[in-house]
Design a protein with these regions (language model features):
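Beta-strand/beta-sandwich contexts
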Residues: 38-81, 123-164, 212-257, 271-272, ...
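Thr-biased low-complexity repeat/linker tracts and other Thr-enriched repetitive architectures
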Residues: 1-18, 267-281
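Short, conserved beta-strand segments of beta-strand-rich sandwich/propeller modules, principally
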Residues: 28-30, 69, 114-116, 154, ...
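Surface-exposed, short loops/turns at beta-strand junctions within beta-sandwich domains
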Residues: 22-28, 107-113, 196-201
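Short, surface-exposed alpha-helix to beta-strand junction/turn motifs within ectodomains of secreted
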Residues: 1-4, 77-91, 162-178, 252-271
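RNA-recognition motif
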Residues: 10-13, 94-99, 182-187, 275-278
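Exposed aromatic-hydrophobic patches
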Residues: 16-22, 101-107, 189-195, 282-283
């Protein structure tokens, strides 16, 4: 390679492979071959030596179960022989989309914590960073269990192993369900505002810490028709309270009553309500 001689390993009767390039500078070099150690060809084959630099890793974390699609960004990334190595795990295939971006999928890990992440080219490290293996996130319950299709309900999601990240999110429905940013409360609780839903239906609520991989526990949140008040009877009553007030309207449901959600608010005072029919409730 230019003036540097290295040993080659025979692959077949027609081709050989250099065991390792010792080119110390970026640029094109002339590659020639000798079969007797003295006389070299003069065919002028070219090899481009590039400096590969990895400057970014995203996302920086994923579950110990693996499966995170990790994007490495940098300069001079080469597709030939590209693989990724996470810690002491065996290297996995890498896809180099351009000289500035490569992708690989994290393998499972037997332990949580930081692991060195290396981008390899023919088993030689050309740069990398670090990747954090997290505990698997769990979702166990949501409060409340239902809300209006217009969205905007402040939903509390309970579970375990939540982390405060900029990518923390809730998803309503599997696959292409709507995702919204979540607010971290603690490792067992996050909050998110329910998105708008086109119709009455149940949606599983899942959580992602890295913005890519969501839980799959199927805890349901039910979208219901919004309640509306048409009129009340009587329109006047004693100031000391205690008189029954019938509220007429729509969207009052037995499930809301059974869950203890059916309530009336009189100015700032909230009281439980009893359902009379699908169109009216009574304090």
């Amino acid at each position: 390679l230019n003036g540097t001689v290295v040993r080659a390993q025979l692959l077949s009767g027609e081709e050989s492979m250099v065991c390792g390039s010792t080119v110390a500078a970026a640029g094109y070099v002339s590659v020639e071959v000798s079969t007797n150690g003295l006389d070299f060809t003069s065919d002028g084959a070219q090899y481009e030596s590039v400096w590969s630099v990895v400057s970014g890793v995203a996302p920086r974390s994923g579950p110990v179960t693996g499966g995170t699609v990790v994007t490495l960004t940098g300069t001079g990334l080469v597709a030939s022989g590209a693989r990724c190595r996470f810690g002491a795990s065996s290297p996995v295939a890498a896809s180099v989309d351009s000289a500035s971006e490569a992708r690989c999928v994290s393998p499972p890990s037997g332990a949580t914590g930081w692991a060195a992440l290396e981008l390899l080219s023919f088993d030689e490290s050309v740069g990398g960073g670090s990747f954090l293996y997290d505990e698997r996130v769990w979702v166990s319950a949501v409060v409340p269990l239902l809300g209006p299709v217009e969205g905007g309900t402040r939903l509390t999601v309970l579970g375990s192993h939540f982390k405060e990240t900029t990518t923390l999110a809730c998803r309503f429905g599997r696959g292409s369900g709507a995702s919204v940013a979540a607010r971290y409360i603690d490792s067992s609780e996050v909050e998110c505002a329910t998105p708008v839903q086109s119709g009455v239906s149940a949606r599983s609520v899942e959580v992602s810490v890295n913005g890519q991989q969501y839980t799959s526990f199927g805890v349901a949140y039910t979208y219901v028709a919004s309640a509306a008040v048409s009129w009340v009877w009587p329109v006047r009553g004693p100031a000391e309270g205690g008189a029954p007030l019938t509220v007429h309207g729509s969207g009052f449901t037995a499930s809301s009553e059974a869950l203890g959600y059916l309530q009336c608010r009189l100015n700032g005072t909230v009281v439980r309500a009893q359902l009379l029919s699908g169109e009216e409730s009574m304090v």
